[in-house]
């Protein structure tokens, strides 16, 4: 009988751990966007990105900034952001994707939407609602 017990143990193999899933670019954007009150997807050499970051800092808001050119998966994220923002045309015809801003985990949009919200007065309430601005 010992032989039978040893044989059973020899053939027992625990189930292998499932292979980790690679997070899709859109899922990663959504996850990163939900981790902070204000999230800016940017390119470090982009003047429009710099302007939107300065706008927030000037208001006393310190956004979490994800520099796509410094991220190994930055190109994938940029394509995902283009889909989310609605830029679907050919690369030569489409406007620059960055900066893309999320406030309270919700997509605000690119620079044009952020500046429009700032000018019409709707940006401050969004920031307060997200907990990024207290005054």
Curated annotation (Swiss-Prot):
InterPro entries: GlrX-like_pln_2, Glutaredoxin, Thioredoxin-like_sf
Residue ranges annotated as motif Responsive for interaction with TGA factors: 132-135
Disulfide bonds, paired cysteine numbers: 46-49
Keywords noted in UniProt: Cytoplasm, Disulfide bond, Electron transport, Nucleus, Redox-active center, Transport
Entry GO terms, CC: cytoplasm; nucleus
Boundaries of every Glutaredoxin domain copy: 26-134
Principal location listed in the UniProt entry: cytoplasm
Subcellular localization(s) per the UniProt record: Cytoplasm; Nucleus
Presence of the UniProt keyword Disulfide bond in the record: yes
Pfam family for this entry, one: Glutaredoxin
Keyword Zinc-finger: no
Function: Has a glutathione-disulfide oxidoreductase activity in the presence of NADPH and glutathione reductase. Reduces low molecular weight disulfides and proteins.
Family: Belongs to the glutaredoxin family. CC-type subfamily.
Protein name in UniProt: Glutaredoxin-C3
Higher taxonomy: Eukaryota, Viridiplantae, Streptophyta, Embryophyta, Tracheophyta
Gene responsible for this protein: GRXC3
């Amino acid at each position: 009988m010992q032989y039978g017990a040893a044989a059973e143990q020899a053939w027992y193999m625990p189930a292998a751990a499932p292979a980790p899933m690679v997070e899709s670019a859109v899922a990663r954007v959504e996850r990163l966007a939900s981790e902070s009150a204000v999230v800016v997807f940017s390119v470090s050499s982009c003047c429009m990105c710099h302007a939107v970051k300065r706008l927030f800092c000037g208001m006393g808001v310190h956004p979490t900034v994800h520099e796509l050119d410094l991220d190994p998966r930055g190109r994938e994220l940029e394509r995902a952001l283009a889909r989310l923002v609605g830029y679907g045309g050919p690369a030569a015809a489409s406007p620059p994707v960055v900066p893309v801003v999320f406030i309270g985990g919700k997509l605000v949009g690119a620079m044009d939407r952020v500046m429009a919200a700032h000018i019409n007065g709707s940006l401050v309430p969004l920031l307060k609602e997200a907990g990024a601005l207290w005054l």
